[in-house]
Amino acid sequence: MVLARIPFQTQARAGAVTMLNAYAASENIKLQVYRARPRSINPPTAFVDAINETMTEFTITMRQRIPTVEVIIVWGLFDSGEAADQRDAFVDGFADWVADNFHGFGTNTLVASVSLQDLPSYIPDWMPDSEKKTYYATQVSLEGFAAT
């Protein structure tokens, strides 16, 4: 028996981007979405910052994969009341969107929003020093599951 193969990290990244775009479109939010860190940020902007994964081998033919996609959503240059309201409405609605679209990482997989964390002094460390700004952002962790 051969282990079923799923390009799960590929599907997880694509699924996160698709869910962000679909939710933003459903709520008429002008959100720039990137599948990796962008060259520049013009809020509101969302992007996949990192993917981490744990894998458990149960037998030669069975394993479990749990990738966690870390998404950063940048709201603005400072924590204003308007940016905070935008953040609250988005993360509440997006968490429900993910729950309703639990196969968002692909067939025979599950996804859930497992963590939300405000980043009130977020500085994109990959940008040149001359372009670095301090932003108000939120990190959303989307955890997938597949048993193959």
Question: Predicted regions: what is each one?
Answer:
Residues 42-52:
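Low-complexity, acidic Ser/Thr/Pro/Gly-rich terminal tails and inter-domain linkers that flank the onset
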Residues 1-38, 51-148:
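Charged, amphipathic alpha-helical segments and their flanking helix caps
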